């Protein structure tokens, strides 16, 4: 343990323990069950959209990494593993541009996920080149599935970050 006697470190650890170990409230979608039902219906449609499950899980994981949602990064990695994703690729998602592990179609989906998640970062949030690359790999139904996965993920991220949902606790 580094700096065991340092009051600042001890205070910071206690603060982190308090905010990380318990949520501020129950998941709002469980408080308003109709909301949860609607989200689950959308997710079912996304998974029927013709995009490989592993690709959708990578999109979810990347958006969650960008937003800093520990709950969604944890659950996203677990879901990707269940879908057959490898550790090698999971470890490389944050650096997908610099690794050889992803197909061109997956790269297009990841680029779209980053653009849609970072809407405020530029005046043209989803540039034509990102959109056109995505349309080279996915038909309209596939694009719809990817876009909805990105937006649902951003919804999950914002809910879980707001209520400080701890990683590892199932709430959805």
Regions found by a protein language model. Name each.
Residues 2-172:
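Hydrophobic alpha-helical segments
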